Amino acid sequence: MKAVVSVLGEDQVGIIAKVSTLLAQKQINILDVSQTIMDGNLVMMMSVMIPENLDSYQLTNEFTELGKEIGVEINLRNAKIYDAMHNL
């Protein structure tokens, strides 16, 4: 499944590394990345390919927990749903 991972929060060392590490542990391929720092806040979007055998509900929970641990908001959305939300 193609999906979009968004990461928002105060910039700090290690955010990208920790998010990328979780993706690698789950064998999730990063297709594209865009990130910027705005007024000290990280705004990152990743297009990823999630293997079909992974449970997206469990994965969403893991990203939520990681976000809490590192002090950012991490959202995972199916790319089709993300596109529909932004093409109204």
Regions found by a protein language model. Give the residues of each.
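A conserved regulatory-domain signal marking ACT and ACT-like small-molecule sensing domains
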Residues: 1-88
